[in-house]
Amino acid sequence: GLGDVYKRQVITFTAACASSKSSSEGETFRDDNVAMQSAYQFKDIHGEQLYAAKKYGVTPIDSRAKLEDNHRRLKLVESNGYYLIDRLTDSSPYLTKGAKNVLKEIGKRFQAELDKGDYREHRIVVTSMFKTRRDIERTRQAKNNTDDSSAHLYGTTFDISYTRFNRTGKSGKAVSNETMCNILGKVISDLREKGECWAIFERSQHCIHVTVRKI
């Protein structure tokens, strides 16, 4: 159950997109010096993300203890063939149905683009999802600032690393993290243009912060 999930996690609070460097599934490669094309350095206004989060998301939940009893509108998100869920430290593996569907679509399109280039199979790495009010509070305290991650309170928002990708197969051509980060940028850009999501390029956090615009 949920309680067991939390018992297995070491609960430390770090920056929103900070995460471990390796995984027991596949092999994760990291390059913090990748250059994302300027077209994919999304700068959607936080207010737009927050408006969408409140419109399409759930009512914020105070604590992880209360999350156990109040997650009916949230869907459990687990690693699969399309994406790897990183070891979550300041969030829980839940999203709304709409957000979970968009995350899967990003993963599918990312892999389709790799396949087109005859590149080796990789998955995207998800570094943050649903946050309780207490998670937000502790993150702010740890960072000693008032960074506003509140879109994560509504289950509509997730962070995807653009510096780390998880290799799941060795057939095909080797592919650099820089190539993959721009493929990821293109995929998110296409969905953003369709009105599926808003996005913010978080250089200091090495992630793209995505808020969906659908139920």
Predicted regions, residues:
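Short, small-residue-biased leader/transition segments that mark boundaries at the very start
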Residues: 1-6
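Extracytoplasmic cell-surface/polysaccharide-interacting catalytic and binding patches
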Residues: 18-114, 211-214
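Stable alpha-helical elements in mature extracytoplasmic
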Residues: 95-102, 106, 120, 135, ...
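Extended, low-complexity, intrinsically disordered C-terminal regulatory tails
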Residues: 107, 111, 118-141
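Bacterial N-terminal signal peptides
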Residues: 7-14
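Extracytoplasmic/periplasmic, Sec-exported soluble proteins
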Residues: 91-102, 131, 149-152, 172-179
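Catalytic cores and adjacent binding grooves of peptidoglycan-active enzymes
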Residues: 147-215
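Alpha-helical scaffolding within the catalytic cores
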Residues: 141-147
